């Protein structure tokens, strides 16, 4: 009886793992396709599509752009979110419920609508499309997330330590940078990392708000629109490989240390 | 020297100002623009509800929101149903020291590029794609089955992403439950299934609802997945919105449609508001 | 532009300015590095987005070309709407839409003496569209047909001779429709015995019914990539709105793909290239335009990666093999048997799009 349920559990887990990994494996396998079209029969292996990606200057620029936008917008989101979380957690703010509501409101609004609002506003005001505009949009979507994560981690025990520091003569700024931030660094790091992930992968805002200089998802979309090609498989596989390495590094260094 | 205590405002003002400037104001601008109308190539800036009236009276427009709601509801249900047992297995059956590893493995494809993920499903589901080739190779099929460019493909593409997301959130929820609950239920004579239905499920419901709402919001506003996998055989709301600016510069209609979509999401939010309070626990 | 929406009342302009400068001042680092000496911005169809076409030009002249790809004149106008005057230098647009774009004052007249007008296939000069009051606003650069692409191993080529096969039951579920309302509506109109140039609102009900019938027997409606993929991977065997632009580029990998102009004819599409009136870099833009219509540029454009199609320059340096794939020698017959894209008024255009959306939703 117990045995049977374990077997069922294993089977189910394998099925779900299969479902989750199927497209990724197909993607990776057909990035080594020899011919133009990335569907069976497989007639590789060939590395020519990786060559095509590496010699595509625009694709590489787009990777750089995405990284830059993700880094800066995540940093801004984390800092603004942290400050706001501190303000709300350590002070009684009149009308605080409403103000907190305003800050987290973008969480329940689709990216498409946020992007459309920014596009229409920027167009009306004559602000040109740019990576900077995308960065602004990414802070809008990530700031509430950072705020919510950090705010939820600000416990009373932290407040006591801060009070002690203040009694010993630390200024507000000193408390914030020397006491609160180090105590909360796992939350800060999680916010930053999550924001990075979302910004790096975000399509629609970047699509609406850029022209020539654009981010990787938009560049991949443009590639897909010019026809079926294993090159898209190659770039997808490269991005996946980079992400896995990053996740592994973070897992092995940051979180392992934290666990001890 | 004791530092003078600053009030809350220096800390919360930047985030508030930012949200007001780049979220609230664009939203108001969009609401105003949605009241204008585009006739021919001329923009009529007299405020009116022309676009909204057109949406509710044009069947092909109105159908988009219906399609969107149907697809999103289906995605949410399928994802929860698939993810819950998975999260349960990870939390209960996998040895504790392997759990973290298994969990990371279960959400690893999360880190493929999102545009590429939909495209990869296209390769899997296409007429000459992997599944059809296998099934025909094994002799299970004589004719390829159409899977790409259908609603099924859109739902599957979405579910792929949200099963990962929900596995993560439900797992976190299950791990927070104290084992005492189950022991107490067992002591009172409940069997496994009774414990699950009367104790575990109600306790994890808030987590499920939060995940389901997140799924709903993210799925209903997504353009890429239906655009790549749905084959334009039907339009979902985001596709209709994008059509307004991809075929002609009809920003008023695009704004009106965005506002309508947003109202629909808000209604969903209110419906599950009691589980979604972002107040501190 | 006809609309008055650029004239904003003073007070609103002040608010807009105040908000704008706040948003701007918020992060001054945006200012960005100074641009390279010569850089032009071009709004183009995807075929221009090919290093084999652009790089030789940049190597020779030192002018960098930034490309933004769009699909359909409506989208181009939408993108122009989202920009500031002077943002764009070069526009590639459907030949049939040149009058519409020129009427909005977007284009600058071109100097005839600097263009190889004598080398261009005469029907493709399209002076009715490109010339107004003695001024030439654009020059054709590439053309082809929206007709029927099909897989000759899977369907009977004889069936492809009549347009009505596209909404008949014989190939039900094996048809894809190219998701661009103008050419496909044009084809349907021709199939119904109408002239694309004379379409009025009165023709729409019949077109609508036929479109819905066609949707009923089709498997999918897709943009350039989706419809190419569909026919290339065998998802469908017939593509409505296809033509050499679909099959020529795929010919090497899949020789079974072919295209035909049915007896009712095909819809002739042509792209024209022009220079924006508000451009600040008209000399560089003209150089690029001259390169595109030169024999070398024409050959590269005709065989660019997104889609192949006929060059307009009779001296284009194509190989015999390439000419064969493009059916160079069949052009006189094809041209005689084709009609231009419909060029509806803004009102009729909106109606057509509504019909199209309705078709998508069925």
Where are each of the predicted segments found?
Chain C
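Conserved C-terminal helix/tail region of periplasmic/extracytoplasmic solute-binding proteins
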Residues: 229, 332-362
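Early extracytoplasmic/lumenal segment of secretory-pathway proteins
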Residues: 37-100
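Periplasmic-binding protein-like
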Residues: 204-214, 253-277
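Extracytoplasmic ligand-binding site segments that recognize negatively charged/polar headgroups
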Residues: 92-219, 224-235
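N-terminal secretory signal peptides and thylakoid transit peptides that target proteins
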Residues: 3-20
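Mature extracytoplasmic/periplasmic domains
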Residues: 276-336
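A bilobed periplasmic-binding-protein/Venus flytrap-type ligand-binding module shared by bacterial periplasmic
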Residues: 147-154, 189-193, 269-282, 300
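A ligand-binding cleft/hinge motif common to bilobed small-molecule-binding domains
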Residues: 97-100, 232, 238-256
């Amino acid at each position: 009886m117990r045995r049977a349920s374990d077997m069922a559990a294993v089977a189910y887990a394998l099925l779900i793992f299969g479902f989750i990994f199927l497209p990724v494996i197909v993607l990776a396998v057909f990035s080594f396709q020899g011919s133009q079209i990335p569907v069976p029969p497989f007639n590789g292996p060939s590395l020519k599509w990786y060559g095509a990606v590496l010699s595509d200057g625009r694709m590489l620029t787009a990777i750089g752009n995405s990284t830059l936008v993700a880094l800066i917008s995540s940093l801004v989101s984390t800092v603004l979110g942290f400050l706001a979380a501190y303000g709300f957690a350590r002070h009684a703010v009149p009308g605080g419920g409403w103000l907190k509501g305003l800050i987290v409101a973008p969480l329940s609004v689709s990216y498409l609508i946020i992007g459309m609002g920014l596009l229409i506003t920027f167009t009306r005001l004559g602000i040109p499309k740019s990576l900077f505009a995308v960065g602004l949009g990414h802070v809008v979507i990530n700031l509430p997330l950072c705020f919510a994560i950090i705010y939820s981690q600000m416990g009373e025990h932290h407040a006591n330590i801060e009070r002690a520091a203040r009694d010993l003569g630390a200024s507000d700024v000193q408390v914030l940078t020397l006491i609160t931030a180090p105590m909360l660094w796992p939350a800060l790091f999680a916010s930053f990392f999550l924001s990075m992930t979302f910004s790096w992968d975000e399509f629609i805002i970047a699509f609406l708000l850029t022209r020539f200089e654009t981010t990787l998802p938009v560049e991949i979309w443009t590639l897909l629109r010019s026809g079926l090609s294993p090159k898209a498989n190659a770039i997808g596989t490269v991005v996946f490989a980079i992400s896995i390495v990053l996740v592994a590094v973070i897992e092995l260094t940051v979180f392992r240390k934290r666990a001890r | 020297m004791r530092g003078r205590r600053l009030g809350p405002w220096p800390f919360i003002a930047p985030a508030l100002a930012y949200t007001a400037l780049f979220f609230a104001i664009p939203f108001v601008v969009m609401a105003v623009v949605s009241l204008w109308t585009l006739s021919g190539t001329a923009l009529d800036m007299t405020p009116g509800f022309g676009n909204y009236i057109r949406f509710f009276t044009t069947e092909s427009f109105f159908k988009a929101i219906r399609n969107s709601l149907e697809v999103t509801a289906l995605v949410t249900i399928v994802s929860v149903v698939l993810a819950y047992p998975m999260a349960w297995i990870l939390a209960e059956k996998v040895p504790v020291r392997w759990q973290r590893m298994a969990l990371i493995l279960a959400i690893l494809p999360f880190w493929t590029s999102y545009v590429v993920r939909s495209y990869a499903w296209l390769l899997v589901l296409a007429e000459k794609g992997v599944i059809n080739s296998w099934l025909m190779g094994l002799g299970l099929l004589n004719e390829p089955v159409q899977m790409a460019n259908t609603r099924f493909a859109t739902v599957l593409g979405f579910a792929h992403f949200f099963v990962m997301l929900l596995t993560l959130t439900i797992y976190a929820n299950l791990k927070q439950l104290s084992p005492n609950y189950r022991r107490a239920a067992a002591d009172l004579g409940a069997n496994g299934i009774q414990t699950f239905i009367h104790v575990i499920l109600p306790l994890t419901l808030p987590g499920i609802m939060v995940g389901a709402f997140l799924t709903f919001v993210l799925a209903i506003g997504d353009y890429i997945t239906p655009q790549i996998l749905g084959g334009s055989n039907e339009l979902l709301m985001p596709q209709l919105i994008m059509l307004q600016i991809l075929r002609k510069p009809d920003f008023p209609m695009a704004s009106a449609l965005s506002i309508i979509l947003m109202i629909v999401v808000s209604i969903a939010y209110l419906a599950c508001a009691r589980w979604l309070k972002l107040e501190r626990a | 532009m006809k609309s008055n929406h650029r004239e904003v009342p003073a007070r609103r302009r002040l608010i807009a300015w105040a908000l704008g400068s706040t948003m701007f001042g918020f992060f001054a680092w945006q200012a960005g590095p100074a641009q390279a000496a010569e850089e032009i911005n071009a709004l183009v169809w995807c075929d221009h987005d090919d290093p084999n076409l652009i790089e030789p030009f940049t190597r020779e002249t030192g002018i960098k070309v930034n490309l933004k790809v769009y699909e359909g004149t409506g989208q181009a106008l939408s993108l122009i709407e989202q920009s500031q005057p002077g943002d764009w230098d070069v526009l590639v647009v459907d030949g049939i839409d040149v009058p519409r774009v020129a009427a909005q004052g977007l284009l600058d007249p071109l100097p005839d003496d600097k263009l190889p007008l004598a080398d261009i296939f005469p029907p493709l000069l399209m002076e009715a569209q490109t010339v107004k009051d003695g001024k030439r606003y654009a020059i054709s650069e590439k053309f082809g047909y929206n007709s029927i692409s099909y897989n000759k191993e899977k369907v009977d080529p004889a069936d492809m001779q009549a347009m009505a096969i596209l909404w008949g039951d014989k190939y039900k579920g094996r048809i894809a429709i190219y998701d661009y309302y103008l050419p496909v509506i044009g084809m349907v109109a021709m199939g119904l015995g109408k002239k694309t140039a004379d379409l009025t609102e009165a023709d729409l009900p019949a077109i609508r019914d036929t479109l819905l019938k066609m949707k009923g027997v089709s498997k999918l409606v897709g943009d350039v990539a989706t419809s190419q993929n569909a026919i290339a991977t065998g998802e469908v065997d017939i593509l409505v709105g296809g033509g050499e632009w679909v099959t020529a580029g795929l010919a090497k990998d899949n020789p079974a793909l072919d295209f035909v102009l049915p007896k009712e004819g095909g819809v002739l599409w042509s792209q024209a290239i022009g220079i924006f009136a508000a451009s600040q870099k008209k000399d560089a833009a003209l150089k690029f335009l001259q390169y595109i219509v030169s024999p070398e540029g024409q050959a590269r454009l005709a065989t660019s990666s997104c889609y192949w199609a006929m060059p307009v320059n009779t001296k284009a340096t194509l190989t015999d093999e390439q000419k064969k794939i493009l059916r160079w020698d069949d052009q006189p017959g094809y041209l005689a048997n084709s009609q231009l894209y419909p060029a509806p008024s803004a009102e009729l255009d909106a109606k057509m799009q509504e019909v199209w959306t309705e078709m998508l939703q069925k």
